[in-house]
Amino acid sequence: MRRRTTTQTDKTLKRWLVWLIREGNAHVPFDRAVARVPARLRGKISAGLPYSPWMLLEHMRISQWDILDFSRNPGYRQMKWPEAYWPRTEAPPSAAAWTRSIAAFKRDRRAMERLVANPKTDLYATIPWGQGQTILREALLVADHNAYHIGQLIVVRRAIGAWKE
């Protein structure tokens, strides 16, 4: 087997990280997870479960934005956990709020993908305003966090009768 250069290895790793952030392997993609949720069920919490589809969507959006902001903003300010990371209401204030949340999530996800894919981004360099974190760690955190909550969203949708295989 031919030995790869560091540049080739970094390009390969970046390509796989972008793919992991965008789609991943072992779960439903984000677009499918949020598609066709009836407006009347977006704020529904099923018995025995703590979240509505809206709460999970907004938590994913807010958390991903926060990770992105931390990854690229020297003036980053940590938000208060947990209240700043979850919506205040079980249901979106409007159908437009649901749509805007999805659009913002996708926009921030693309921004994270661009940050990772940028040839100037050193995945292993410590983020100067952090406490040892790297862009590699933050990219994996975005992918991991989103995959976890996409799974929760599917469970919630099944429980409220809003998921068809």
Language-model features and meaning:
Residues 88-126, 137-142:
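Acidic/histidine-rich alpha-helical segments that form the ligand environment
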Residues 1-10, 14-27, 31-34, 39-87, ...:
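Short, contiguous alpha-helical
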